């Protein structure tokens, strides 16, 4: 059995156990991860139970890739532009705090992701849905995701696959090459993931799977990012009453 077929069976079982009549709600960016996840959902549930949500923040220069995917899969989709709430929220916070912080760029980058997840859950609540998480193992390992943003969801079909392995799933599923090999980026900074990370997914994926890496400085950077971002993938710590 191909790996993609195993994931498809897992998705079927998840919905059987957690909402046999529910729809799958998925944010569509047009990148490899959301494309592969959406294709897996269609294979598992049928196209009528998969609902895509395109969420540009104003004008999105590569939104054609998102339209290409939903048309290729022939799924129902909605386009919700988050630019107005994004500007209203960030401007309100800026006006009230009035501080010059080095975290400003991070906050401006993370906010759209959290608004998108709020949008997905809003739609999910209205359409009897379960929200698909589209993060992969490579992103999760170094914390390259937004807490309570794209790292959220009800179920996660590809979170145990590296970026390299997600592309292999895309090949198995017969997705268009331009979607499988689209250069990953955050959609805000106009820089690729690899430019921002300072190393390639090829190097990261090999390190994750084998522990092998040639550049010790990059190894140190990856290890540091992994430890610093574990809180994003672990359950929230809670006080244990009476030590229980």
Model-derived features: positions:
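ATP/NTP-dependent adenylation/nucleotidyl-transfer catalytic domains that generate, transfer
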Residues: 3-26, 40-43, 48-51, 57-58, ...
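Conserved G/P- and acidic residue-centered "switch" motifs that form tight phosphate/ATP-binding loops
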Residues: 31
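Phosphate-binding Walker
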Residues: 35-36
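N-terminal phosphate-binding loop and adjacent alpha-helix
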Residues: 61-65
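Catalytic-core regions of hydrolytic enzymes
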Residues: 114
